Structures are given as structure tokens and as C-alpha cells.
């Protein structure tokens, strides 16, 4: 297959050269179109050239993310051609300057695509697919859709730093999470779009704009596991002191549906903010390219997956949603819910069987969770049967194993990433990897010991960092106390893990083997790998084949 640059030369007098000289020819072409400002078309209007350029750039972005680099290169060329012809006759000086900046950016990206992805197969004789990343996951890229399809959708809620959106055609709701594109594709970081991961939120579609990748994700309505546990403790405490027998029976019969009372959405939204904001304000208010809209855009994040939580820190600058009720936990940091457990609550577990209980964290302003999954000075109690924790742990393990098999590391798995569906099963928020999205870790996940000690350092991360996070989450579920609370000075190479005496021996053994300071010594690494982790006595009653099925 010949290179696009060989087929689409701008000047009719030039003859195509052999593909062996494709790289030099591409550079010649790019240099030519940089100097073609004088070759304008007199009758081209402002509206025509911006609309035509937007069409070409949108197609280039879609093909770029889908890793169809030859088509992307072609569309970038066409888009730049249109802009160069139009800028010559555009009377608006401010708009001309903005267009020049766009041209520079598109030329830079076209050259990067050629140098990184197109020259290698042609010059080395390799197959055209030889430099394309993540080929085994290419079928999932059929989920890519035109970003304009999002424009008709209505924002009905804001859940932390993602948007709850309604499809006007079906009336169904889904979650939209935006990831900022850095426009510098990493050669080392491949694009990996996981699919078929059990116990993880499903990616339904994704959309590409000039500056962002928008993930269209399944809406898991159960809220976070941590909010469920805290509300259960509160409802049981309330049931002991007040409430009808019928209400207490209902809570016992529906343990997985007894979630926090839906919170009212923020008020004071401005007109026009009930639509998805696809782009930030532009350099020039008159310049709209690639489906851009001059409106406030969602907070952009780099990693994690979304239905009720995200895995990056920072405050949200999302547009406020229309008033109404959101039927899942949507409380922001610093806002209290009537259903939240009171500070200082002490609840004595009752009933037969091994029951685990302890002191957990209360409400606090944290990037991890607004429902108690971050640092907190308040103390709340929950109790969970070890068998139930074992089931949730097995579901988390299966999800992490599948992500690792597809080449994805979570790095900062924390309570905000653990959702609970209406059947009571764990659902991880969505994790993926994009060559154009710079990975970031939640700083508070590191500070609160949810992330492994090596995260944020200079050493290359392995699956071991997720097994630490897995152990940290299990520590909190089993003991009721966060790892950072029981180890306020952190965990070093010679730190002795603090475990309550009442913890079962298999549970204590599992936590000790997972929370090893040295990554290579953690359970799940080295000889035996994940199989050794699955065969640990703590999971002796788990039927793994049925769990995956």
C-alpha cells in the first residue's frame, strides 16, 4: 500500500516518487503546504472553509484514535489544505491568527503520525500493521462514534467528576467521562481498550474531539461499596432505636438495595448547561473546528473508570446539572447526607457466624470519595461477614486478573473505584490506557496507602502495585479500619503489619502476604503468580470457574 503523501501531492506538476522515498516526500509535502498561504481560492467564504475543515479534522481525529493512521494522515492533509486556502481570504485578523495556530498543531500531528507509524512498515518491508499498537484489541474500536452524537444528549446529573446523561431517543441513562488528550502520542504507552472484563463497568462507546476522549459508560446505580457499608451500619443502628418492624424486615430482606437516600442535585444551574459540553472556550470565539462548541467542558481526567467515581484527584469544574433527584449517591465532598452515619457511632455486631467489625473513617473532603473513602477524622463502624468479604474479594481479583492479562494497570485502585450493583456484586469503575492520555495517580490514594509504595517513584510499575491496592482494600473491609489509620507513619521495609487478634488466620495470612513492601515478594507475583493467590486458604470456598462464568 502506497503512502497517502505519494498519492495526494498538492501540485499537479509533481510526479509520485517510489515508496522507498516516502519519508522525504512527506517532508517536502508538509513544507509545501506550510508555504501555501498565497495560493488562496478567491470565492471561498469564511463559513465554507471552517465547516469543510471541521469535517476533515473530525474524521482525522476519529481515524487517529482508531489507529487507522494512514487515513488519519490523509484527513489531516485535507483539513490543512482547506484552512490554508480559506485563511487567505478571511477578513477577520483575529480568526486568521487562531487558524494559523490550528494549522501548526495539525501539521505537527500529521508529521508525528508519519514518523511514528507510517514510515516504519514502508521502509523496512514489514507489513502495514507492524507498528500499530494493541492489535489484538482492535475489534473494540468499532465502539468509536462521531462526537456529534453526544450533542443531543441531556445532562441530568453530576456524580463527582463525571456526568450522568440521558439519551433522548431511548430515555436510558449513561455516564460520560472525559479524558484530556495531550496530542503527544507515547511510543511506549500503547492504547489498550479493555473489553470482556468481568465485574468491571462496561464501555459502551467512545467519542473523540480535538482535545478530549469521551467515554460513554454503563450506569451502575448501586453507588459505591463504601457508602453501602456505612449506610447499612447507620440503618441498623437506627433500627435498634426507632423505626417500624416492617422497615427493619425490609432492610434485612434487601441488604444490597438498602442504599443511601438519593441526594438532590446542585441548584443554580444556568440555562444551556443541561447539554454535554464537548470543548473548552477557544482561542477565538469565532473559530469552531471539529465539532467544537464554545461552552464550559467537563473536568478532564486521565485514568480510571467512571460510573459513580473516578480515580484522579482534584476539584470538579463540571457544569451544574438541572435540579431533581439522582437515584444513586451523588453527594460532593463537604456536603453531608441525612443518611450518613453519625460521628462516634458504635454498633455491636450481632448474629451467628464470624462477623468482622471495627472503626472506619467518617466523612471528609477527599478526592477518593465523598462518602467516607478518604482521610477522615470521624469514626464510623461497620461489620461485614468474612464470607461476604471473601466473595467481593474474589470478584475484585477476577477483574484485576483480566485487566492485567490485557496489559492494563490500575495503579491507584481505591474505595471510590468499587461500585456495588443492585445484585450485590462488585463492579470496578472503568480502567483503560490511551497513548494520547497522560496517566495520573490520585495523590490521596498514595497518601492513604491505597497505592503501593513504589507508585510515584522512578521504578517501572508491575502488576504488584495492584496487588498492594487489593490488599489495602481488603484490610479495610476485613478490619473496618483503613490501613493508613492503623499505620499513620506509613509502611516501610521493616514495618510490622498491625492486625486485630480476632481476625481469622487465613485472612491475616492473606493480608500479610499482599502488603509486602517489596513488590516482588507480594502474593500474586513470582512463581505461581495469580494462580497461587487464588489457591490461598482464604479463598478455599470460592469456585472460580462459576465466578468467571
UniProtKB/Swiss-Prot annotation:
Q: From which domain of life does this come?
A: Eukaryota
GO molecular-function term, one example from the UniProt record:
protein serine kinase activity
- Cite the Protein kinase domain residue spans from the record: 145-539
Record keywords: Kinase included?
yes
Give the Enzyme Commission number: 2.7.11.1
Q: Where is this region: Disordered?
A: 260-325, 330-349
Q: Which UniProt keywords apply?
A: ATP-binding, Kinase, Nucleotide-binding, Ribonucleoprotein, Ribosomal protein, Serine/threonine-protein kinase, Transferase
Q: Which catalytic reaction applies to this protein?
A: L-seryl-[protein] + ATP = O-phospho-L-seryl-[protein] + ADP + H(+); L-threonyl-[protein] + ATP = O-phospho-L-threonyl-[protein] + ADP + H(+)
One cellular component term (GO) for this entry is: ribosome
Q: Which Pfam family name is an example for this entry? A: Pkinase
Please name the InterPro entries in this protein's record: Intracell_Sig-Traffick_Protein, Kinase-like_dom_sf, MIT_dom, MIT_dom_sf, Prot_kinase_dom, STK_RPK118-like
Listed PROSITE patterns? PROTEIN_KINASE_DOM
What is annotated as the active site? 412 (proton acceptor)
- Binding residue positions for ATP: 151-159, 177
Gene3D superfamilies found in the cross-reference section: Phosphotransferase system, lactose/cellobiose-type IIA subunit (1.20.58.80), Transferase(Phosphotransferase) domain 1 (1.10.510.10)
Query: Which stretches make up the MIT domain?
Result: 87-115
Which PANTHER family does the protein's record reference? Answer: RIBOSOMAL PROTEIN S6 KINASE, RIBOSOMAL PROTEIN S6 KINASE-LIKE 1
Q: Which family does it belong to?
A: Belongs to the protein kinase superfamily. Ser/Thr protein kinase family. S6 kinase subfamily.
Q: What is this protein called?
A: Ribosomal protein S6 kinase-like 1
What is the originating organism of this protein?
Homo sapiens
Annotated gene: RPS6KL1
Amino acid at each position: 500500500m502506497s503512502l497517502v503523501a505519494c498519492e495526494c501531492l498538492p501540485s499537479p506538476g509533481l510526479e509520485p516518487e517510489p515508496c522507498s522515498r516516502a519519508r522525504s516526500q512527506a517532508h517536502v509535502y508538509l513544507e509545501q503546504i506550510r508555504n501555501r498561504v498565497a495560493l488562496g481560492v478567491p470565492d471561498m467564504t469564511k463559513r465554507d472553509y471552517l465547516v469543510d475543515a471541521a469535517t476533515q479534522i473530525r474524521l482525522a481525529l476519529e481515524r487517529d484514535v482508531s489507529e487507522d493512521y494512514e487515513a488519519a494522515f490523509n484527513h489531516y492533509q485535507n483539513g490543512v489544505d482547506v484552512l490554508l486556502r480559506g485563511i487567505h481570504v478571511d477578513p477577520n485578523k483575529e480568526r486568521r491568527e487562531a487558524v494559523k495556530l490550528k494549522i501548526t498543531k495539525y501539521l505537527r500531528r500529521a508529521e508525528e503520525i508519519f514518523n511514528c507509524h507510517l514510515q516504519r512498515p514502508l521502509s523496512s518491508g514489514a507489513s502495514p500493521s507492524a507498528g500499530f499498537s494493541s492489535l489484538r484489541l482492535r475489534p473494540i474500536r468499532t465502539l468509536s462514534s462521531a462526537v456529534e452524537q453526544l450533542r443531543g444528549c441531556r445532562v441530568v446529573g453530576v456524580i463527582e467528576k463525571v456526568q450522568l446523561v440521558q439519551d433522548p431517543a431511548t430515555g436510558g441513562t449513561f455516564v460520560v467521562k472525559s479524558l484530556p488528550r495531550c496530542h503527544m502520542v507515547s511510543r511506549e504507552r500503547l492504547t489498550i481498550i479493555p473489553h470482556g472484563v468481568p465485574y468491571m463497568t462496561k464501555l459502551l462507546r467512545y467519542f473523540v474531539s480535538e482535545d478530549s476522549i469521551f467515554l460513554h459508560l454503563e450506569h451502575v446505580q448501586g453507588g459505591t461499596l463504601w457508602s453501602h457499608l456505612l449506610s447499612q451500619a447507620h440503618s441498623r443502628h437506627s433500627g435498634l432505636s426507632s423505626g417500624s418492624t416492617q422497615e427493619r424486615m425490609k432492610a434485612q430482606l434487601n441488604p444490597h438495595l438498602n442504599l443511601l437516600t438519593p441526594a438532590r442535585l446542585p441548584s443554580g444551574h444556568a440555562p444551556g448547561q443541561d447539554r454535554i459540553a464537548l470543548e473548552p472556550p477557544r482561542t477565538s470565539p469565532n473559530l469552531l473546528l471539529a465539532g467544537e462548541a464554545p461552552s464550559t467542558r467537563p473536568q478532564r481526567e486521565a485514568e480510571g473508570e467512571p460510573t459513580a467515581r473516578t480515580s484522579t484527584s482534584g476539584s470538579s469544574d463540571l457544569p451544574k446539572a438541572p435540579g431533581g433527584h439522582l437515584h444513586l449517591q451523588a453527594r460532593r465532598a463537604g456536603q453531608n447526607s441525612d443518611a450518613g452515619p453519625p460521628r462516634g457511632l458504635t454498633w455491636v455486631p450481632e448474629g451467628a457466624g464470624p462477623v468482622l467489625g471495627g472503626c472506619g473513617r467518617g466523612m471528609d473532603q477527599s478526592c477518593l470519595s465523598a462518602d467516607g473513602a478518604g482521610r477522615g477524622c470521624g469514626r464510623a463502624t461497620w461489620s461485614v461477614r468474612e464470607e461476604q468479604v471473601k466473595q467481593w474479594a474474589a470478584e475484585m481479583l477476577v477483574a484485576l486478573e483480566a485487566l492485567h492479562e490485557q496489559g492494563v494497570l490500575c495503579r491507584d485502585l481505591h474505595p471510590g473505584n468499587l461500585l456495588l450493583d443492585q445484585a450485590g456484586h462488585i463492579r470496578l469503575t472503568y480502567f483503560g490506557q490511551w497513548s494520547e492520555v497522560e496517566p495520573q495517580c490520585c495523590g490521596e490514594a498514595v497518601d492513604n496507602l491505597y497505592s503501593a509504595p513504589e507508585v510515584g517513584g522512578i521504578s517501572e510499575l508491575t502488576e504488584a502495585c495492584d496487588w498492594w491496592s487489593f490488599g489495602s482494600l481488603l484490610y479495610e473491609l476485613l478490619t473496618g479500619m483503613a490501613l493508613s489509620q492503623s499505620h499513620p507513619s506509613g509502611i516501610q521495609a521493616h514495618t510490622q503489619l498491625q492486625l486485630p487478634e480476632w481476625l481469622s488466620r487465613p485472612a491475616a495470612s492473606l493480608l500479610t502476604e499482599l502488603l509486602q513492601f517489596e513488590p516482588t515478594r507480594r502474593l500474586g507475583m513470582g512463581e505461581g503468580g495469580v494462580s497461587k493467590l487464588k489457591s490461598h486458604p482464604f479463598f478455599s470456598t470460592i469456585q472460580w470457574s462459576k465466578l468467571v462464568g
